[in-house]
Amino acid sequence: MRRLAALIVLLVFTSCGSAPPVRTSPPVSDLVIPTTVPNGKVDVVVKATYTVGETIRATIRLSPTTGTLRGPLDPFIQASGFHGTATVRHLAIDPISVGAGSAEVVVLWDMRDDSGTAVGSDDYSLVFNVIDDSGRTTTVGTTLQVR
């Protein structure tokens, strides 16, 4: 009888425990895509994915370790697919020059091509150049996933 009572108490005790916590997906944070250049680093901060019709926002951070960096120069959006790559949009962005520390510039793309037509779901690339005070040019690019 004692064993039965102990078993019942044990079952009641263990069944009153809380349920395991519900697992949720972690929030999607921004991605920082670093590129090393001859005299420092360029970071491009983007979202993991964008929604069709949403204005694309990317932050470009120039961080020279010596000398200066200037950019983004000649920025454009290109589409990549089975048939190769194609320039979708040339962007008008005022470049910045950084001599010490770091500085940022925000890039906005309204998901339209050069003729003003809205574009759809695809993998796009933000491509631009940076130049250092020695005249060395580095091309930087990052993928923008639009779904």
Question: What is each model feature region?
Answer:
Residues 1-4:
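Positively charged n-region of N-terminal signal peptides that target proteins for export
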Residues 7-10:
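Classic N-terminal secretory signal peptides
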Residues 12-15:
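C-terminal motif of bacterial Sec signal peptides marking the signal peptidase cleavage site
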Residues 17-19:
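Bacterial signal peptide processing site
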Residues 22-38:
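N-terminal low-complexity, Pro/Thr-rich disordered segments
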Residues 33-42, 48-113, 117, 127-131:
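Contiguous segments within soluble domain cores/interaction surfaces
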Residues 123-125:
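Short, conserved beta-strand segments of beta-strand-rich sandwich/propeller modules, principally
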Residues 136-147:
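Short beta-strand elements
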